[in-house]
């Protein structure tokens, strides 16, 4: 599994959804953390298929983390990738960091020019809010909301605030 194989999986989901006779022509794609990066990359590859994009604490740090040799709880030599990387209870294959090692994620996401909502917590200890700010600057049409005190994976109070932003964005 890698971010790029997850993009392929999401592309298959989009194709399937588009094939259903009862689905709308408009698609709102949403992802959180790594799923946010996957959704952003997928929207960039298929800008005509995605009407709106919602990213909650998107993990645009993944390529930088791979280059630095630390991802989640794992540490490794980025110049000599091991076959397996142990991230706590979740082992990752070499392909996980390898797929993003040379990626400029902010360049990769810019082909998507549709509307984007980014919601990120100011107290996120996993993905610094600066990544969300940089993404908002990279997109042509982005709305960024920073949730004061929000961590990576919002708590109940922060969920409520994030859902308010999502509901307003989806209603437009």
What is each stretch, according to the model?
Residues 45-92:
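Hydrolase active-site cap/lid region
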Residues 21-32:
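Alpha/beta-hydrolase fold nucleophile elbow
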Residues 112, 118-120, 124:
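Short beta-strand/loop motif that positions the catalytic acidic residue
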Residues 90-108:
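Active-site nucleophile elbow and catalytic-triad environment of alpha/beta-hydrolase enzymes
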Residues 150-161:
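Catalytic histidine-centered segment of alpha/beta-hydrolase-like enzymes
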Residues 125-131:
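Conserved alpha/beta-hydrolase "acid-adjacent" motif
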Residues 31-35, 39:
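Gly/Ala-rich beta-loop-alpha elbow adjacent to hydrolase catalytic centers
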Residues 1-20:
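Alpha/beta-hydrolase active-site loop
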């Amino acid at each position: 599994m890698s971010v790029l194989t997850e993009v392929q999986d999401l592309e298959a989901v989009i194709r399937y959804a588009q094939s259903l006779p009862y689905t709308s022509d408009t698609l709102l794609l949403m992802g959180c953390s790594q799923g946010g990066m996957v959704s952003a990359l997928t929207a960039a590859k298929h800008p005509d298929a995605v009407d709106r994009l919602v990213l909650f604490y998107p993990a645009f740090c993944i390529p930088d983390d791979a280059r630095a040799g630390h991802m989640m709880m794992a540490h490794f030599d980025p110049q000599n990738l091991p076959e397996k990387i142990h991230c706590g209870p979740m082992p990752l294959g070499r392909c996980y960091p390898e797929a993003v090692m040379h990626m400029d994620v902010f360049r990769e996401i810019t082909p998507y020019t549709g509307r984007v909502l980014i919601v990120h917590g100011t107290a996120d200890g996993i993905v610094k809010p600066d990544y969300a700010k940089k993404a908002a600057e990279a997109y042509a049409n982005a709305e960024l909301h920073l949730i004061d005190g929000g961590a990576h994976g919002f708590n109940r109070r922060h969920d409520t605030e994030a859902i308010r932003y999502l509901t307003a964005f989806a209603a437009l």
